[in-house]
């Protein structure tokens, strides 16, 4: 008999129908077969017997699976479903639910169980011996063929509720096996490490978690790392972790920490706590192990409940590929996320700190996110380490953070000291200037707009400064009216970037439209995207003001020019139109970004504001007590607030931090908080009036709680400097709460006219509704004194005015003063000037591509016309602007000298000063007093300016490669520019250099490193080619590079131009000025230009490996004599 595969649309035929089909099929065979065959067919059901060990299947009815459902439907024995060996447990659950008249969509709440048991007693009652829940993808029929029950036992498949199965699993406890294995592991560890070393000061009567943060040895003693997830010499923990993981995962599959989310224990309760807990299941239970409960994550602290919380995977949306984990606390379970108590399912993110009870603190890590820990998490970890070490026992020190929320504690004295020191550091009077050619305008604008990462540490107004310098140079240098086109380019590019960022944010937040997802939305989810929007809003405001102030002066050049055939009028008109269009676009960008920020911030307020009306600030919350106890004297006002109020204030505080971090204009900051306060006031007032009677908010006890919560909110606004805005926009809600909180004896003495005068923000219909509800709650009779006046009586029936409208929000007004971008200022912050030097390098790179220096033409000319011998190369022109200041170190002058406009016409050939040799090996260092251009030094741009280092972004372009040859090619080796070079017969083997240096030659000769025999009699310890590993320091590598084409060497190659004393490169001791960099991290630099080489070093990571070739004295002198 043949049955098709099971599907959701098939239903099981009745027994009579099955018998008819079987009888018909048998009769057909009976008519067509011989008598012997007829007898075998008819006798087949009698010969095949059912297996008594398998109760869910029958040999006489293959393809039919009996699923027993006593646990979900009382009185129901079993239901039959069609199944094949390929049918999965999940599909069979759906079919069985349909047979049991249950909804198939709830299949996730049920599980198919493989149950082993037997019948006992005269009434043959089923007794379960073993139960195992099948996975969704397991195949019951295949499982049945591979594993058979023990003799005397039978198997059947049961449908049970998932929660009941998990509860049964939690009650099981195996203490014997755990104790035996624990003792074996202990003996194994003792044998592996020999004599056990006790921690200094430890006591046998004290129980301390091995994974706590305060395991610090004696001063000067190397810390003992007992257990760690990082590679190291101690390996005893790995065996224990693997065994624990094998026990918890069934011993079948090993899960890597780099593949699964996990909890890393930061602070535990005793030494039996595990260091890592993998979160590789659909759901994990956290709790204390008892006789009746055995959770997945067992914690031994006495304040942890048997079922403390759950960690489960959230339902994955089709539009999202990532899987989020939800932390679900149970009733009376103390669970904190980032030191904030939660009472509802909360999504946890990579880097969150989870606290269970009063002792356990975990770090949640998700390796799949491939992101570093957030900065706020690192701040919390540093603060937690100080807390565990007991270093901060009193008032918080400068730069400390709140131990509850991780926020940086601002000290007024420290801020004043920083502000007083700022002018002293910027007193170098560096004048800002940026020169470029008109042909490079588009490339320069695009580079400036992508230069700064909004989430980085650079000055947030750097794009505004650099773009205003571009506008200034265009207006003063290029033909009249050229700056108008530049304004349009800048405005349109900023508009495009702002729209793209807001569009990305809208697409991300589209998934939070349903109420369930919207309830999980928090302000921290929006911060990464809001950073971009605040960044460009702030820069657009500064650029708009610069255009408004400087455009009239720039247009005067057009008015003063000679009028030729009416060209002046048309040019002036076109420039004015372009100027107005650019300002209009920037105004739209400011308005649009402001509206988008307000929209998403109010969206988070919409989620947290209802809790403010239900909050009881007079109750004691464990999180607040823990904060006060941990901080001693906590100056962070947010962490001691009640939970509901803290959520609202967190939105305001995060917004304030973003506005200040991105240096948004102070007037725009005030306007944004005016709108947020307006939204909060209207939302709270409308909910109180609309839902107050049903929710009991008009009861005086509840009103007093609301009044206390609002007072906390207003106190925060006052401390944040927004007191006048809060008093203005919270007037209506505060008036309502004040009336409802007044005692009946006092309020009944006030007339309607007096109430209207004292609370002018309330409309007559609103005041009438409030007094009516007050009468009902206070059980007061009619009060004639509250009767509306004749002029107000007509308005009390206008219910359209009862609730406030969100359309009457405060307007957005662009500021007119108080801007920060000032190009004429003599004191400029180091970060801005550092980026300016970087952009000057970028412009210099564009110039060298367009106009090759040093007498070099393009590649074709170089190949077509070989350079003449004894030719004198021309020096590279200067690219330093007028008034460029000096950059000083303690003993090294690295800044460029201020030069006039004629500096570009001067030669730069300079003799080498102060070159000396060490041990006769040819190690050379430039004199510390030698003046060099600071823009030549290779160091990340976000480092301090003492000494100043900059680098060039990748802008790949290969320079012409040619060699100035002073001798013929008849020799086996020729010496060019002081370096030994092989002839074509010796320099290439299978496309690679024959002396072992990897990398294609691109068909061009290049200076080879000097062999050992040519370095002198005392150079036995020097190799011609060697490998150097350097770690980037706080100021980068401390090494400046230069392309040999732009030196008197006149040959391509990347050479060391500068070594900063005490830098990583100089500290290595092997690198010298003039040495050539052949490769970086295995990537050849032969044939690469300067910008590509610097970009490769920049993106190479914190540790770089260089292949370096030694150069002789002649090459070093030419490199040293060059100017950057």
From Swiss-Prot:
Domain named Ras-associating: residues: 61-164
UniProt-listed SMART domains: DIL, PDZ, RA
Pfam families hit by this protein: DIL (PF01843), FHA (PF00498), PDZ (PF00595), RA (PF00788)
Domain Dilute: start-end pairs: 516-809
Keywords: Cell adhesion, Developmental protein
Biased composition (Polar residues): 926-937
Basic and acidic residues composition bias: residue spans: 238-252, 903-912, 960-969
One GO term of the biological process aspect: neural crest cell migration
Bias type Pro residues, positions: 866-876
Miscellaneous comment text of the record: Knockdown results in multiple defects in neural crest-derived lineages such as cartilage, pigment cells, and enteric neurons.
UniProt subunit comment: Interacts with RAP1A; in a GTP-dependent manner.
Name listed for the protein in its UniProt record: Ras-associating and dilute domain-containing protein
């Amino acid at each position: 008999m043949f049955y098709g595969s099971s599907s959701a649309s098939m239903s099981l035929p009745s027994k009579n129908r099955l018998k008819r089909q079987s009888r018909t099929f048998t009769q057909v065979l009976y008519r067509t077969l011989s008598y012997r065959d007829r007898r075998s067919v008819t006798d087949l059901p009698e010969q095949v017997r059912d297996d008594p060990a398998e109760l869910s299947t029958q040999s006489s009815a293959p393809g039919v699976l009996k699923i027993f459902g006593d646990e979900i439907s009382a009185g129901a024995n079993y239901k039959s479903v069609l199944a094949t060996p390929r049918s999965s447990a999940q599909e069979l659950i759906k079919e069985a639910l349909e047979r049991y008249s249950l909804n198939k969509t709830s299949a996730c709440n049920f599980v198919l169980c493989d149950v082993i048991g037997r019948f006992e007693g005269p009434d043959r009652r089923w007794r379960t011996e073993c139960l195992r829940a099948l996975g969704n993808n397991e195949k019951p029929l295949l499982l049945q063929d591979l594993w058979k029950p023990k003799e005397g036992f039978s198997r059947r498949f049961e449908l049970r509720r998932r929660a009941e199965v998990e509860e049964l699993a939690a009650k099981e406890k195996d203490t014997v096996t755990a104790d035996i294995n624990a003792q074996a592991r202990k003996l194994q560890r003792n044998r592996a490490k020999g004599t056990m070393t006790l921690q200094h000061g430890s006591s046998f009567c004290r129980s301390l978690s091995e994974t706590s943060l305060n395991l610090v040895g004696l001063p000067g003693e190397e810390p003992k790392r007992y257990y760690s997830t990082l590679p190291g010499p101690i390996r005893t923990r790995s065996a224990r972790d693997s065994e624990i993981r094998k026990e918890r995962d069934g011993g079948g599959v090993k899960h890597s920490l780099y593949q699964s989310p996990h909890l890393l224990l930061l602070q535990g309760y005793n030494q039996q706590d595990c260091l890592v807990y993998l979160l590789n299941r659909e759901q994990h239970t956290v709790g204390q192990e008892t006789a009746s409960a055995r959770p997945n994550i067992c914690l031994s602290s006495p304040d942890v409940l048997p079922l403390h919380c759950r960690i489960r995977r959230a339902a994955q949306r089709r539009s999202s590929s990532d899987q989020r984990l939800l932390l679900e606390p149970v009733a009376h379970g103390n669970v904190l996320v980032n030191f904030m108590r939660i009472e509802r399912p909360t999504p946890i993110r990579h880097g969150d700190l989870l606290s269970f009870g009063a002792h356990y603190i975990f770090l949640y890590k998700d390796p799949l996110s491939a992101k570093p820990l957030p900065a706020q998490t690192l701040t919390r970890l540093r603060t937690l380490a100080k807390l565990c070490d007991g270093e901060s026992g009193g008032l918080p020190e400068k730069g400390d953070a709140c131990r509850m929320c991780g926020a940086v504690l601002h000290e007024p004295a420290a801020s004043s000291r920083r502000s007083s020191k700022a002018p002293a550091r910027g007193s170098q009077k560096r004048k800002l200037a940026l020169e470029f050619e008109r042909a490079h305008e588009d490339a320069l604008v695009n580079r400036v707009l992508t230069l700064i990462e909004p989430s980085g540490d650079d000055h947030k107004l750097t794009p505004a400064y650099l773009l205003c310098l571009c506008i200034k140079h265009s207006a003063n240098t290029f033909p009249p009216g050229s700056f108008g086109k530049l304004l349009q380019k800048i405005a349109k590019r900023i508009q495009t970037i702002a729209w793209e960022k807001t569009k990305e944010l809208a697409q991300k937040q589209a998934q939070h439209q349903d109420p369930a997802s919207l309830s999980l939305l928090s302000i921290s989810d929006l911060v990464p995207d809001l950073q971009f929007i605040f960044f460009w809003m702030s820069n657009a405001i500064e650029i708009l003001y610069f255009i408004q102030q400087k455009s009239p002066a720039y247009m005067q050049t057009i008015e003063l020019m000679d009028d030729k055939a009416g060209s002046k009028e048309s040019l002036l008109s076109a420039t004015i139109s372009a100027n107005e269009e650019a300002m209009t676009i920037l105004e739209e960008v400011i308005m649009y970004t402001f509206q988008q920020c307000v929209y998403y911030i109010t969206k988070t307020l919409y989620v947290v504001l209802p809790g403010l009306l239900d909050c009881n600030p007079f109750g004691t919350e464990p999180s607040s007590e823990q904060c006060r106890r941990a901080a001693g004297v906590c100056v962070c006002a947010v962490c001691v607030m009640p939970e509901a109020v803290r959520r609202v204030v967190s939105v305001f505080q995060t917004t304030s931090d973003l506005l200040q971090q991105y240096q948004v204009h102070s007037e725009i900051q005030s306007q944004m908080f005016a709108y947020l306060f307006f939204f909060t006031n209207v939302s709270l007032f409308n909910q109180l009036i609309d839902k107050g009677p049903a929710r009991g908010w008009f009861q005086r006890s509840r009103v007093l709680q609301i009044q206390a919560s609002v007072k906390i909110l207003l106190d925060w606004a006052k401390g944040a400097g927004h007191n006048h805005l809060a008093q203005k926009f919270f007037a209506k809600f505060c008036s309502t709460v004040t009336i409802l909180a007044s005692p009946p004896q006092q309020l009944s003495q006030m007339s309607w006219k007096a109430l209207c005068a004292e609370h002018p923000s309330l409309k007559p219909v609103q005041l009438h509704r409030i007094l009516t509800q007050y009468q009902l709650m206070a059980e007061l009779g009619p009060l004639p004194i509250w009767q509306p006046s004749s002029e107000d009586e007509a308005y009390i029936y206008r219910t359209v005015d009862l609730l406030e409208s969100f359309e009457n929000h405060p307007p957005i007004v662009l500021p007119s003063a108080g801007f920060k971008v000032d190009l004429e200022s003599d004191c400029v912050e180091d970060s801005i000037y550092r980026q300016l030097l970087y952009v000057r390098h970028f412009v210099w790179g564009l110039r060298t591509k367009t106009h090759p220096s040093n007498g070099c033409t393009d590649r074709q000319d170089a190949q077509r016309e070989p350079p003449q011998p004894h030719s004198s190369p021309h020096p590279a022109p200067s690219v330093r602007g007028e008034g460029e200041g000096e950059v000083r170190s303690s003993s090294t002058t690295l800044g460029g000298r201020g030069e006039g406009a004629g500096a570009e016409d001067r030669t730069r050939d300079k003799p080498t000063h102060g070159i000396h040799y060490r041990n006769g090996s040819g190690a050379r260092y430039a004199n510390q007093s030698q003046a060099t251009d600071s823009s030549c030094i290779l160091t990340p741009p976000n480092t301090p300016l003492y000494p100043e280092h900059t680098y060039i972004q990748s802008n790949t372009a290969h320079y012409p490669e040619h060699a100035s040859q002073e001798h013929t090619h008849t020799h086996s080796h020729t010496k060019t520019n002081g370096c030994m070079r092989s002839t074509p017969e010796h320099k290439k083997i299978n496309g690679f250099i024959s002396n072992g240096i990897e990398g294609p030659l691109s068909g061009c000769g290049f200076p080879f490193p000097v062999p050992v025999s040519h370095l002198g009699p005392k150079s036995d310890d020097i190799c011609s080619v060697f490998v150097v590993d350097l770690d980037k320091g706080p100021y980068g590598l401390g090494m400046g590079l230069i392309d040999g084409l732009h030196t008197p060497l006149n040959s391509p190659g990347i050479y060391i131009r500068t070594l900063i004393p005490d830098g990583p490169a100089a500290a290595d001791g092997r690198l010298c000025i003039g040495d050539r960099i052949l490769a970086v991290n295995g990537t050849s630099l032969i044939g690469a230009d300067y910008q590509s080489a610097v970009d490769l070093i920049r993106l190479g990571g914190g540790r770089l490996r260089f292949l370096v070739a030694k150069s002789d004295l002649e090459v070093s002198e030419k490199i040293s004599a060059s100017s950057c």
